[in-house]
Amino acid sequence: DYYASRGLGDVYKRQVYDSYDEMFTDPDVDIIYITTPHNTHYGFMKKAILNKKHILVEKSITLNSDELGELIALADENNVVIGEAMTVYHMPIYKKLNEILKSGTLGRVNLITMNFGSFKEYDMKNRFFNRSLAGGAMLDIGVYALSVIRWFFDSKPDNMLSQLKTAPTGVDEQASLLLSDKEGQMATVMLSLHSKQPKRAMISCENGYIEIMEYPRAWEAKITYTD
C-alpha cells in the first residue's frame, strides 16, 4: 500500500515510490536490490540495466541461462554491475575451507553429497508450488546445493542426470541429481519441498571428509581425517 509505505518513509526519512518505473528512472538511485518472486527477475533487471542501475538480486538470479546471458551482455553494454545474493560465495567459512583443501592435507575432492528438505503444506497459490511464479524445489532451494558443488568442484559440471517428482501444479516437488565434471568429480543432490531433511553437505576427499550443517548459512564445519 503506497500510503502506508509513505507513512513509514516519513518516519524513517526514506524515499517511497508509487511504481517500479518511478524507482527505475530516479536519477538519484545508483543500485537496486530486487527481492521479488523469481519469475519477475528478468524483466525488472532489464529495466534497471537500461536505466543504468547496478543490481543485487535474490536467488535464483534468472529462470534459465538464456535470460542470464542476455542480461550479462546488456549490463556490459551499459557499464553496470549485476550480482546474485547467493550466501555461499561470500561466507568466510567457505573461503577457509577452500584454503584447507588447497593445502592438500585432505587430498583431492572426489565426491560431494548434498541434502536440503523442508515440508511445505501444499497450496497451489503459494509461490513454492505456483508454476507462474517459477516455483519448485530447484529454483528455491536447489541453487544453494549447486552453488556449494560449484565452489568445491575443480571445473564446471558437464554431465547431469535428474529424477523429479512433480506437484499437481507441475513444479518439481522433489528432485534427485547426479553431477560430474571432466576431472571425474561427482556430486549427488537430494531436494524436497515435501520431506524434512537436514541442510547437510559432505565433501569427501582422499584423506578425510568435511561435514557442513546448515550450509546455506553455515558458521562451522567438522573436518575428519581418516589417515
Where do the protein language model's features map onto the residues?
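Beta-loop-alpha module in the N-terminal Rossmann-like domain of NAD(P)-dependent dehydrogenases
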Residues: 14-72
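Hydrophobic residues in well-ordered beta-strands that form the structural core
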Residues: 18, 57-58, 82-84, 212
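Single conserved hydrophobic/aromatic residue that forms the stacking wall/gate
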Residues: 1-12
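Rossmann-fold dehydrogenase core element
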Residues: 69-87, 108-111
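Structured catalytic cores of enzymes that bind and process phosphorylated ligands/cofactors
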Residues: 31-40, 44, 127-128, 137-149, ...
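Predominantly a Rossmann-like dinucleotide-binding segment in NAD(P)-dependent oxidoreductases
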Residues: 88-160, 168
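Contiguous beta-strand/loop segments that form the cofactor/metal-binding neighborhood of enzyme cores
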Residues: 147-219
